[in-house]
Structures are given as structure tokens and as C-alpha cells.
Amino acid sequence: MAKLRFIVVGSGWRSLFYWRIAQALPERFALCAMLCRTEEKAEKMHREYGVPVSTSAEQCIALHPDLVVVAVNKASIAAVSTEWLARGFAVLCETPAALEEDALRALWQLHRQGAKLQVAEQYWLYPTLAKRLAAVRSGALGTPQFVRLSVAHGYHAVSLARQFLNAGQQPVRVTGRSWTEKIIETDSRWGAVHNGALVEKTLQQHTLEFAGGGTAFLDFNGVQYHSYLRSTHTSVQGERGEVFDDTLRCLDAAGEPVCRQLTPLPDPLAAAAAQAGLNEDETAIACFLDRMQGYLAGGAEVYPLADALQDAYLALLMERALAVPGQSVESTPQPWNTEER
């Protein structure tokens, strides 16, 4: 298989993930250029990281990339993605696809008109989460009824919850509440923090009740992404058993209770990524990029756009629920719920 050639639009923290992936797995990926807004930023990215850079969209177009990765600030993702789709390129945009319902619907309309758009929702490809999803999907728990997630925020959490519960595009009722939590900061995007600073962070809790009967309890504080004092947790329960983090408790074929530890799924690319020094988030994105090859060749979507838009839409409902604690916010039908995909 030929390597995937792509450009990245954006030069922030997230864009560097794609550069590290291309560096770690050069036989599969080639980052042709990073499109920066200013000469100063382009010079900085090239000087500090060795990234091939440009400030000209025309120069990037002339490179004839297979894919355009849009990794700009959240408020600009939808507009920038639309610009590159209009130029005739396939686009993989960072999450969320948009921050407003109208923009989500507009992206769906572009998809219906044939635009090649995917959203880089990667959490289901985390090796630790992939094995838990596989255990649930194996039927070992029976029908998943409850999922408790303290793994990620917003649309990422919604994506996982819907998959663990096999909830698809079901209508949902959302309630939410938030608290301020004091914690000593120990880590960050840029590395460990040792100054003992006591900071205030926001803990958010949401309940999502799906029309099909499954319920998700989402509990997350943004500090969990980078902290030595706060871990993450996953619990999924069905009538025949439970997955709690990496432990599966269930009944065997004879009806006897068994308990076993989940092991990583066989995935040569994930193994190669880890061996090359990529972290779990980068590994998941690398796996997503690799699957984009098939999509670009006319195959199935990597993560259906309808699901990515539903994730973003429900994340908006979660924000609204926080503004009315004790009250519920209900989803309404969206075009991607029912239209042919």
C-alpha cells in the first residue's frame, strides 16, 4: 500500500500529533506541509520541530495531497473544512466538527452532496478502550444497560457511551451538573509540573438516558487528561456481567461465574506505533489515518460522519444541561439520524 500523503492546516498543539505520527511511521505516512497563518509561526514550527511548512494554500494545493487534515481552533474547524472540501479535497477534521447546530447540518448536507469528510474521533481506537469495547460487543455481558465513564469530556465521552451501549442514533434525555474542584497540578500538555500549585478545575457529571433503555453516567474533570493524581475509569454492566476497566466478570457457557483480565487486541499498526514511541492518543490517530486509505479508495467510512455529528450535537445538549441543573434537555431529530447515509 502506498503511503498516505497529507497536509495539516493549523500549527497548534494538536497539529504536532500528525507530524510525530509521520516521523514515527514514515513507511505509511508523509506530512507534505503544515499550513501556518503567519511567517513567524511557520519559522517557529520549522525551527523547533523540523516540520515542512508553508503559509500559502496555493503551494499546499500544488503538492496534490491525498488528504487535508484540519487541525485549527475549534471555532474555525467547520469553516476551514468547508473551504478545503470546496477545493475538491478529502478532509479529516479534528473534533468537534462544529460548535453550532446549523454548522453541523451544513456539513451533513455537504456529505450528502458527495464531499469526502471524516472527523478524527479516535477514542474507540485507543488500545485500552478497544479491548473493552470488544469484550462488550462479544455479548459476554448480555445487553449493555449501564455505562459509567470517567475517561474523556463531551463528544469523546458521548462517542464511547453510544458505542458501549449500542445506542446508535437513539433519542436521548440529558441532565447535568458541575462543581469546582481544588487539586494540585502535577502534569500538563508540555510535561510534569513540580511547583505544587493548587488550582481550581471543573468537575462535570451528566446522565444520558437513551430511548432504547441504556443509560450513561459521564463523570469527568479536564485535569484527568494530564494528572498523576486523577485516573480514568470505565464500567459497563449487562445482565450477564460487567467490564470494569480491564477486568471482565461474566458467566461462561455453563452458567458459571468467571473473571479474567482483558488483553490488547492484535493490531500490528498499534504495536508498531507504540514501539516507535507514540503515546496512546497518537497511536489511535495513526490507526485512524491508516484506515483513511480505504475510505479514500471508495471504502466504508472510518467513523461514520453521522456518528461524529451526533456526538457533537449531544455535547451541545450536555452544555445546555449544565445551565439548568436538575432539569433535563431532550434531543430532537436531526437530518443525520434518519436520512440515507
Predicted features along the sequence, with ranges:
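Short, well-ordered coil/turn residues at beta-beta hairpins
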Residues: 71, 94, 210, 219-220, ...
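C-terminal glycine/acidic-rich active-site capping loop/insertion
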Residues: 224, 232-306, 327-331, 337-341
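C-terminal helix-rich "cap/oligomerization" subdomain common to oxidoreductases
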Residues: 1-3, 59, 67-69, 115-116, ...
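N-terminal Rossmann-like dinucleotide-binding module
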Residues: 1-49
